[in-house]
């Protein structure tokens, strides 16, 4: 009886080991989530994280291979070890990139941010930035799917941006979101190629685009809790 129990125990260990090995092989051979590689080579991708051109070719090639294979945790580790891009991911945080997308009337997007400059809590905050997530058929991506670098309650504002017409004089770039900063990612993002404001020399703010009649902004939440009176405010 003792020999039988020992044999059963041995067999269980063997079967478990085989199952784990099989699972590992399946994971290694799983198809990449990256189905469209926007960057044609390692140097094109490097332009998104190495503007000073200091990263050697061997490391560039390694990063490019990990990016194409969708090995996000390994890629983030490489960035941390080599202190790259201030900790941010390459490719503006996106994969399966589609460039020069149009903005059409009725489309809605959302984002988290603070105000530009000092905000006293009176009047409309000045809101800037150019990365959003699309709201598709009413679906709002979770905070974790956005893979942002701060906790949700660190952001003063969560707001919705509605496109009012087909007249925006610039395009966008859409992508799936790279998992990063301990967040699951894999949501969708749209980068707005917003031009400079001649009066300031900086990228136009969302307020400026609203003033020009292209968009409407609605502040939905103050995740930080700092500005509850701003919730429901419409900037147009």
Where are these regions (language model features)?
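Bacterial N-terminal signal peptides that target proteins for export
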Residues: 1-8
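Intrinsic disorder/low-complexity signature
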Residues: 3, 24, 53, 96-99, ...
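Bacterial N-terminal signal peptides
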Residues: 8-17
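Bacterial Sec-dependent N-terminal signal peptides
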Residues: 17-37
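Catalytic toxin/effector domains delivered as secreted proteins or via bacterial secretion systems
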Residues: 72-236
